[in-house]
From Swiss-Prot:
Example GO BP: defense response to fungus
Disulfide bond entries: 36-74, 40-63, 49-72, 53-73
Keyword Secreted assigned: yes
Main location, first listed in the record: secreted
Record's protein name: Defensin-like protein 71
Compartments where located: Secreted
Signal peptide as annotated in the record: 1-22
InterPro entries reported for this sequence: Defensin-like_dom
Domain of life: Eukaryota
Keyword Signal: yes
Transmembrane segments: none
Source species: Arabidopsis thaliana
Family: Belongs to the DEFL family.
Length: 76
């Protein structure tokens, strides 16, 4: 009985510490991208995103994030 109780408490703590909303921003910030402009699509990919970021004064840009919701993000 004590083992089952410890296991249930462990599972509850582990799931309460997980925050799925934090993952996309950590992916973006992990690569140094500061500013996300728009969502990328089949017609708006890296070849359109990078020049847009450079025009706005950033050094680089690309479609990053979690599939299927990639965003055009710019790097300082």
């Amino acid at each position: 009985m004590a083992m089952t109780q410890v296991f249930v408490i462990f599972i509850l703590l582990a799931t309460s510490l997980c925050n799925s909303n934090a993952l996309p921003s950590s992916v973006i910030n992990g690569f140094g991208y500061d500013y996300c402009i728009v969502e990328c699509s089949i017609t708006f990919l890296d070849d359109a995103c990078k020049p847009l970021c450079i025009d706005r004064g950033y050094s680089d840009g690309g479609c990053i994030g979690l599939s299927p919701h990639f965003k055009c993000c710019c790097k300082k």
